[in-house]
C-alpha cells in the first residue's frame, strides 16, 4: 500500500470511528499533511527514506507536548493550553519523517485504568461483548491503544507509569511496550510521577514498536532522568558479553513467577498464560519457575509513591502560573482563595483530587515514615527480587547486595519473565460507571497488579496479544488476552524479540 493511500485510510478511520472517542484533537487541514506524505513517498521511491516511519501517521497521548496541537492532559484545568514547544519524542519522530496524526484521549493526567477519568468523555474499546455493550479500553493510554487497533494511525505513543501502556494493549489486542526507565526522553511530557513515568509505544506488532523505539532511544541533555552517553555505552558493552549476546540466536531460559498465579486470575487469562508457556517450550526455550516474593507488596507501594509525586507535580496548576483560571471565589469567600482553591476544585477531576490528597497525606510529617519511606523500601526490595532471578546483571549498578546473591543461589537464572498483563479480559464500561466510585477506583487499582512491579524496578516490559476463547466471560469477540514479557534493565531488544515470537498466536 502506498504511503498516501495508507494516510488516507487512517484519516477515514478517524472519522468512521469517532464514536470510540480515541482522539481529542486531529489534523484539521489535510492539505499540508498530504504534501508531507507525498514528499515521503518520493523519498521512498528514490531510496532516500528517512526511516521506517517516514510518511506515516503517529498519534501522541495528550500529555505529550506538541506545538501545533493543544495539550490538555484530558483535564479541565489545561483545557486551553497549547505548548510553545514540541516534546523531544515528537521532535525525534518528526525528524525521522513521521507525521503527527493528532492527540489521543486518556485518563486525566494519566491517572486511571479504564480511560473513564477524562473531561472529554470515556474511550470505548473497539471490541464488543455479546450483549453489544461497550468494553473498557484500559488506561490511561486507552486512546492511543484504540487508535492503533482501529488503524486510525500507524503507531502511537503513550506514557506508562504503572502499566498505562501495557494494560490498554492487553484490552485492545495491540502490542504495548514500556522501555527501560531513562532510555526515552521525558522532556516535554507532562509529569505524573517523575521516577516512574516512561514514554511507551503502542503498535500493531512488535516489529513496528521496535522501529519507533530505535528512533526515540537517544540521549537528551534536557531531561535529567535520561541516561547519559556514558551509561548507554555501559549498557551496550554489557550486552556484548558472549553469554548475553548469544541469547538473540539461541534458546532462552524463561521464568514463570509463581506469585503471579493468583486466585483472582480469570480462567481465560490463565489458559492463555499456560498455552503461551507451552508454545515457548515447543520453540526450544526452557521454562523455570521463579519467586518474586515482594510482588504482593508492590501494588500498595506504588499507590503510595505515585500519588506522593503527583501531589508535588500538580501543585503548579493553580490558575496563576499554569492552567485555566476560575475567577469566582470559593465557598469561603476569602480573597486569597479566588485564584487557587476554586480553580483547582473545578479544574481537577475526582480521581486526580483523590490522588493529590492521598499523596499529600503520605508526605505529611505524621505519615511519611510509615507510608512513603516504607514504600521506598518495598520498591528497593522489588528491584532486588528481579535482580536475583535474571541471568544478566543490572548494567547500571551491577554490584549485587547480599540479599540478591542469597536469593539467586536458590533459583534459576532466567533471561526474561512471562506472565499475564491483566488478571482478566476487559470489563464492561457500564459496570464500571454504575459501581460506587470509591470501590470502582479500588477495583481499577488492582488491574495494575501484574504491571506495577516492572514499573517500580524500571524494567522493560511488553504486552502482546494472544488469541484464546474468552467466551466464558460473556464476550463474543473477547478472544484476546495480553501476555507480558519482562526483561532485565537494558534488555529491551530481547523483550521485543520474545514478544515478536509470541504475538498473535492462536490457542
Swiss-Prot record:
Q: Matching InterPro entries, A to Z? A: Amidase, Amidase_CS, Amidase_dom, AS_sf, GatA
UniProt keyword Protein biosynthesis, yes or no: yes
The answer to keyword Nucleotide-binding applying to this record is yes
Catalysis: reaction(s):
L-glutamyl-tRNA(Gln) + L-glutamine + ATP + H2O = L-glutaminyl-tRNA(Gln) + L-glutamate + ADP + phosphate + H(+)
Task: Indicate where this protein resides in the cell.
Answer: Mitochondrion
Listed GO MF terms: ATP binding; glutaminyl-tRNA synthase (glutamine-hydrolyzing) activity
Q: What is its EC number?
A: 6.3.5.7
Gene Ontology CC entries for this record: glutamyl-tRNA(Gln) amidotransferase complex; mitochondrion
Entry keyword set: ATP-binding, Ligase, Mitochondrion, Nucleotide-binding, Protein biosynthesis
Instruction: Please name the GO terms of the biological process aspect recorded for this protein, alphabetically.
Output: glutaminyl-tRNAGln biosynthesis via transamidation; mitochondrial translation
A Pfam family the protein falls into: Amidase
Point out the coiled-coil segments of this chain.
none
- Gene3D superfamilies, per the entry: Amidase signature (AS) domain (3.90.1300.10)
Which superkingdom?
Eukaryota
By sequence similarity, the record places it as follows: Belongs to the amidase family. GatA subfamily.
State the function annotated in the UniProt record: Allows the formation of correctly charged Gln-tRNA(Gln) through the transamidation of misacylated Glu-tRNA(Gln) in the mitochondria. The reaction takes place in the presence of glutamine and ATP through an activated gamma-phospho-Glu-tRNA(Gln).
Q: Give the record's subunit note.
A: Subunit of the heterotrimeric GatCAB amidotransferase (AdT) complex, composed of A, B and C subunits.
HAMAP family per the UniProt record, alphabetical: GatA (MF_00120)
- What is this protein's name? Glutamyl-tRNA(Gln) amidotransferase subunit A, mitochondrial
Organism annotation:
Aspergillus fumigatus (strain ATCC MYA-4609 / CBS 101355 / FGSC A1100 / Af293)
